[in-house]
C-alpha cells in the first residue's frame, strides 16, 4: 500500500471519527470539531503528526527497500560490466590469435604453392630432357639401322657384281692384277 493509500485510509478514519464526535458534541458531551474548514490548523497539525508518525516507518521502509534494490541493481550492473569487459578482452585476444593463425596459414599456403610450382617446373624440365634424350636415342638407333641396311645392301650389290663378273670370267691380266693386289695386302712381295 502506497502513501496515497495510507493518506486515504487516514482521511476516511478521520471522517468516521468526526461524525462520531459531532454526534457526541450535539448530545452535550465533549467532542472534537474535525471540520477541516473550521479547525484547519489543529486538524492539519494532527493529520501531519499522524502521517509523520505512521508514514515515517512506511516511508523509511519503502525508501530503504528502494535503496537496497538500487544498490543491488548497481552491483549487478557493475558485475555484468566486469564480465562484459573480461569477455571483450578474451574475444579481442581470440581475434588476434585467429588473425595470426590466418596469416600463418596464408603464408604457409603461399610457400606451399611456390614449392609446388618449382617442383612442377623441375619435373617439366626433366620430362623435356628425357624426351630429348629419348628422341636422340631413337634417332641414333634409326641412323645406325639405316647405315647397317645400307652397308648390307652395298655388300649384297658388291657380291652380286663380283659374282656376275666371276661368272663372265675374268681376263687373264685382270686376274693377275687381282692376285698381286691380294698378296700385297697380305704383306707379301711379288
Curated annotation (Swiss-Prot):
One of its GO terms (molecular function) is proton-transporting ATP synthase activity, rotational mechanism. The keyword Ion transport applies. The keyword Kinase does not apply. GO terms for cellular component: plasma membrane-derived thylakoid membrane; proton-transporting ATP synthase complex. The chain crosses the membrane at residues 34-54. It is a single-pass membrane protein. Keywords: ATP synthesis, CF(0), Hydrogen ion transport, Ion transport, Membrane, Thylakoid, Transmembrane, Transmembrane helix, Transport. It holds the Pfam family ATP-synt_B. InterPro entries: ATP_synth_B-like_membr_sf, ATP_synth_b/b'su_bac/chlpt, ATP_synth_F0_bsu_bac. SUPFAM superfamilies: F1F0 ATP synthase subunit B, membrane domain. It is found in: Cellular thylakoid membrane. Belongs to the ATPase B chain family. F(1)F(0) ATP synthase produces ATP from ADP in the presence of a proton or sodium gradient. F-type ATPases consist of two structural domains, F(1) containing the extramembraneous catalytic core and F(0) containing the membrane proton channel, linked together by a central stalk and a peripheral stalk. During catalysis, ATP synthesis in the catalytic domain of F(1) is coupled via a rotary mechanism of the central stalk subunits to proton translocation. F-type ATPases have 2 components, F(1) - the catalytic core - and F(0) - the membrane proton channel. F(1) has five subunits: alpha(3), beta(3), gamma(1), delta(1), epsilon(1). F(0) has four main subunits: a(1), b(1), b'(1) and c(10-14). The alpha and beta chains form an alternating ring which encloses part of the gamma chain. F(1) is attached to F(0) by a central stalk formed by the gamma and epsilon chains, while a peripheral stalk is formed by the delta, b and b' chains. This is ATP synthase subunit b. The gene is atpF.
Amino acid at each position: 500500500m502506497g502513501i496515497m493509500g495510507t493518506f486515504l485510509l487516514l482521511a476516511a478514519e478521520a471522517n468516521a471519527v468526526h461524525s462520531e464526535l459531532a454526534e457526541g458534541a450535539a448530545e452535550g458531551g465533549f467532542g472534537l470539531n474535525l471540520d477541516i474548514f473550521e479547525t484547519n490548523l489543529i486538524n492539519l497539525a494532527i493529520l501531519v503528526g499522524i502521517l509523520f508518525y505512521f508514514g515515517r516507518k512506511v516511508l523509511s521502509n519503502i525508501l530503504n527497500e528502494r535503496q537496497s534494490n538500487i544498490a543491488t541493481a548497481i552491483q549487478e550492473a557493475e558485475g555484468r560490466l566486469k564480465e562484459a569487459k573480461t569477455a571483450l578482452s578474451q574475444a579481442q585476444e581470440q581475434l588476434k590469435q585467429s588473425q595470426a593463425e590466418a596469416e600463418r596459414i596464408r603464408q604457409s599456403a603461399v610457400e606451399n604453392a611456390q614449392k609446388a610450382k618449382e617442383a612442377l617446373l623441375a619435373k617439366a624440365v626433366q620430362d623435356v630432357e628425357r624426351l630429348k634424350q629419348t628422341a636422340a636415342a631413337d634417332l641414333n638407333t634409326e641412323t645406325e639401322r639405316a647405315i647397317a641396311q645400307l652397308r648390307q645392301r652395298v655388300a649384297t650389290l658388291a657380291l652380286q657384281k663380283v659374282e656376275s663378273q666371276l661368272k663372265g670370267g675374268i681376263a687373264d691380266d685382270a686376274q693377275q692384277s687381282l692376285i698381286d693386289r691380294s698378296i700385297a695386302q697380305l704383306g707379301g712381295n711379288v
